[in-house]
């Protein structure tokens, strides 16, 4: 992996790093900043799709694998949870329409699309303020959490 000693010249998004290295998302190899393992191809795409920033250690670029993202998102939630509000309350607090707010998934940190925000409104789910930012749940984490709860309920039924 190429080194970027000058902070002004560092790309901070994965597609920009690919351009700087003259490679593609399919061919790039990058390590996790937390566990130091090389990201798998699916994790590279998920990192790019999540619109997360690349971090640099000693001029070397690092991303984060999905396991570490989920772990550190949970730690962030447990340490920095502030409050939970419904969408209408969130709009009145911020004086901004829900569509224009930048809200990420509390589990995988992916930005929520308008359909995922609308799902929170329709099902009367709350958004959570964690570390100063509002979060919800993306479609993938919503369904996987629901399946986990169902499995636990089935296992505990007598």
UniProtKB/Swiss-Prot annotation:
Miscellaneous comment as given in the Swiss-Prot or TrEMBL entry: Belongs to the high risk human alphapapillomavirus family. The cancer-causing human papillomavirus E6 protein has a unique carboxy terminal PDZ domain containing substrate.
Similarity comment: family membership: Belongs to the papillomaviridae E6 protein family.
Subcellular localization(s) per the UniProt record: Host cytoplasm; Host nucleus
GO BP: DNA-templated transcription; regulation of DNA-templated transcription; symbiont-mediated perturbation of host apoptosis; symbiont-mediated perturbation of host ubiquitin-like protein modification; symbiont-mediated suppression of host cytoplasmic pattern recognition receptor signaling pathway via inhibition of IRF3 activity; symbiont-mediated suppression of host type I interferon-mediated signaling pathway
GO cellular component: host cell cytoplasm; host cell nucleus
Highest taxon, organism lineage: Viruses
Quaternary state and interactors: Forms homodimers. Interacts with ubiquitin-protein ligase UBE3A/E6-AP and thus forms a complex with human TP53. Interacts with human NFX1 and MAGI3. Interacts with human IRF3; this interaction inhibits the establishment of antiviral state. Interacts with human TYK2; this interaction inhibits JAK-STAT activation by interferon alpha. Interacts with host DLG1; this interaction leads to the proteasomal degradation of DLG1.
Short sequence motif named PDZ-binding domain, residue ranges: 156-158
Organism of origin: Human papillomavirus type 70
Protein name: Protein E6
InterPro entries the UniProt entry points to: E6, E6_sf
Pfam family, one: E6
Gene3D superfamilies the record matches: E6 early regulatory protein
UniProt keywords, alphabetically: Activator, DNA-binding, Early protein, Host cytoplasm, Host nucleus, Host-virus interaction, Inhibition of host innate immune response by virus, Inhibition of host IRF3 by virus, Inhibition of host RLR pathway by virus, Metal-binding, Modulation of host cell apoptosis by virus, Oncogene, Transcription, Transcription regulation, Viral immunoevasion, Zinc, Zinc-finger
Zinc finger (unnamed): 32-68, 105-141
Annotated function: Plays a major role in the induction and maintenance of cellular transformation. Acts mainly as an oncoprotein by stimulating the destruction of many host cell key regulatory proteins. E6 associates with host UBE3A/E6-AP ubiquitin-protein ligase, and inactivates tumor suppressors TP53 and TP73 by targeting them to the 26S proteasome for degradation. In turn, DNA damage and chromosomal instabilities increase and lead to cell proliferation and cancer development.
GO molecular function: DNA binding; PDZ domain binding; zinc ion binding
Cysteine-cysteine disulfides: none
